């Protein structure tokens, strides 16, 4: 594993013209989407390809954050573990960035580490969020590549997503933005996406792309009514396994975008 402070090694990697791909995922309110991005990472994983998933802050499975690696000038390999599902796992910050925001210098350091890490992988997925003070993305590299916004099926989510997209546009300019609607069928998700896309076009001049919808596998009990059992599953409840298929569909759409999105070779 390389030393991120080794300038010669970094230059060799840049000269190699890596086609590493970076996909960042952000929650509708500018916050992380931890469990959701894990499922997407598993769906994105392909044979003979290496994938790195970077969480926003330290998880139980990640003993060392990249923030700690940078602070202690430690070997970068200490900040990466092999996940049982087959991808590599790391994390950016030591603590939740909502309560412990990073300094600009540290953001720059972490951005450099992630950029160099990407040369060892085919795909890098970053769980990003908006700074609560500057309202910019955690890493500048996230604004140079694909950004996926996760929103649920609600009017509140549409408003929150609009505010998040507004901040991203104001701070970073033209960023390729895609949307996934969770807790919804494809048709339901498309309806909410169209409403969000319409207001973003009208007021921000931003056009979004719909990646798909992710239903939930949990059964939803019917309301208690006279003469009916409360645990009867409503007809529109999603069947188990549909969630996994929906993630695969989103991963497939992301894969189709590969040839039209920038990579580190041109960043």
Task: Describe the residue ranges of each PLM region.
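Extreme N-terminal, non-catalytic leader segments
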Residues: 1-31, 35, 42-49, 75
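C-terminal lobe/tail of nucleotide-utilizing enzymes
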Residues: 1-18, 174-267
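Phosphate/oxyanion-binding active-site loops and adjacent basic polyanion-contact surfaces
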Residues: 4, 33, 103, 156-160, ...
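Short, high-confidence coil segments that cap the C-terminus of an alpha-helix
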Residues: 20, 49, 121-122, 174
